[in-house]
Amino acid sequence: KLKRQERREKNVYYAVVDTNILVSAALAKDRLQSVPYAVFQGISKHLFTPIVDENIVEEYCEVMSRSKFRWNASYGQRFVDEILKYAINEPVAPTDFALPDVDDRIFYDVAFAHRDKNAYVVTGNIKHFPNVPFAISARNFLDLINPVQSQIFVNDVSVSYSASTLMSALQALNEDALKNGSAGMSEEEIVAEIKAARAERK
């Protein structure tokens, strides 16, 4: 047992979670099979620490309150608030690193500023981060932080019934999406809605 604990303490992971992972988790048709949903289970089980800054928090809040998703806006805010309880939240210096969408740079900048922690950008759109060696898909990130149990982890029925307030907040969002019919929205629709939120902020 002691050796297991020592191994866990050595495997400390940090990640900047792209907004599309939040939305995809909340809109999962089947949360027991949803990799984005399992990412947040990873936070609640302290398998990794999320990192944000005020720009990322602002985008999280704006996107999670979009009427397109048709869920209770207070549920979206509660979910963001719960993520922040686990997160490192501090300002970082902006960079001029070239990305296909300049608005994705906020995620790059935070991960880059925390490279001393080997921080990753966890995204549902890896093609949006070309030439970024620390950008990683949600599936590959789960394999990294929990390699032995990653398959069980995603399919574990306890994901639905977690007592953590983070997972309770996400479950409330997901159940609202299932009820109102917005669950299962395509990746293209999710990306379009995130872009719309960014355009309105400018």
Roles of regions detected by a PLM:
Residues K1-L2, M167-K202:
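Short linear interaction segments
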Residues D101-Y120:
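Acidic, metal-associated active-site segment
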Residues K1-P50:
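Short, well-structured N-terminal submotif of metal-dependent ribonuclease cores
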Residues Q41-T95, Q171-D176, N180:
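PIN-domain endoribonuclease scaffold, especially VapC-family toxins
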Residues K1, D116-Y120, I126-A172:
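Acidic, PIN/NYN-like endoribonuclease modules and their adjacent C-terminal/linker elements
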Residues I21-L22, I56, F107, K127-H128:
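Alpha-helix capping/helix-boundary segments
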Residues N55-I56, V102, G124, E189:
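Short beta->alpha linker loops
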Residues D96-D103, I126-H128:
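Acidic, metal-coordinating catalytic cores used for nucleic-acid/nucleotide bond scission
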